[in-house]
Amino acid sequence: MTTWDGFQAFATTPAAAPPPPGTPHRSLEERLAYHSRFVTVRTPAIDALAKNVRTLMILGRHQTVTARPSLTVTGPAGVGKTTALLQVGYACHLAHTRRHGAAATVGHVPVAYVLVPPAASTKTLAAEFARYLAIPVAAGMSQAQITNNAVCHTYTAARVQLVMIDEIHRLNPRTTTGAQSADLIKDLTERIGATFVYAGIDVTTTPLFTGVRGAQLAGHASLIDCDPFPARLGNEEPFRDLITAMETALDLRHHKRGTLPKLAPYLHDRTAGRIGSLARLIRQAAITAITALIDGTERITKTTLDAIRLDHLAEQHHRPHTRPRSRNTSTP
C-alpha cells in the first residue's frame, strides 16, 4: 500500500461483496477468502472525511502562494482511521479515472499514501515519499537532494492531487529530528500542489499540535474525530446499526439474521465500541463457523464469540474486575 503499485492494485481490485440473493453457494475456499477480506462498512467518519476532502481539494485547487488547507484524522487506536483514509484515497483515485478516462491518466498518480517511519528523520521521511513513486535514491544523496530534485519534481510531474500521511503521531517536534521532519512536511505542503490529509492516534494530545511548529500545522488543518461507536446516541443506536451492517454482509449458510444485533450490549463490552475489534471478532467467528461446523451448522453464536481471543486492547477492556474479598475483622 505504501507504493504506487500497491495502492493502484488496492484501488482497482473489486471490493469484497456478499453474493446476490438466489445465486449458487460459493465454495468453502471462496467464502474463507471473502471473510478474510470482508466488506468495508461506510461509517460517519468515512462520510465526514470524504465530504471535507472533496471540498478542500476544490478550495485549494488554484491556491499557489501558501500551503493548501489540510485535514487531520484523530482518535484512539482501532477505531478505523486508516480505513477511512484509504477509502477516501480510493474514492479520489476512482473519481480521477472516471473524469479523465483510463487511457488519459497513464502516468498520472492522483493519490499518494505515506507512513511516517518510527523516529523519522528528514532523510528517512523524504525517502518514504520517494519510495512511494519508486524514485531512485542513491546512498550519498542528501535530504535536500531527495526532496528538491526527486520528490517535489516527480510528485508535481505525476499530478498528485491528494497526499495521505499516516501515523503522524510518530512525529515529535520537541526533538531535533522531529522538529526537522515537521518542517519538511510543511515545506512539502507548500511545494507540492496537493491536498494533505494526516491520520494519527490522539494527535491533539501529542506535541504535534503544540509550540510554534504545532501552531503552524493546527492553523492549516481541520480535525475529523474518529471515535469508538457509542452504544446509544440520543434515540439512535450506532453500534447496533454497525453490527447489523456487518451481519448482513456475512456469507454463512445457516446463520440467522438478527442474531448479532441482539448481542449488541455483549459485543460493545467485548470491543469497547471499536470498529477494528468488532470486525475482527465477526470475521474470525465466521471463519470458525465455516471451518469448525459447530453443531453441524455454519452460524455464529455467543458460544462461538466467547471462544475467540481478541486484540490485547479489547481483552483488557473486557477483562472482568473482581472485588478483593474483605477480611472479617469482627471479634467473636
For the regions a language model picked out, list residue spans one by one:
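Conserved lysine of the Walker
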Residues: 81
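Mid-core helix/loop region of P-loop NTP-binding domains shared across ATPases and GTPases
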Residues: 11-27, 106-108, 121-128, 136-183, ...
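C-terminal alpha-helical "lid" subdomain
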Residues: 2-20, 24, 232-233, 238-332
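The catalytic "switch" region of P-loop NTPases
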Residues: 172-174, 181-262
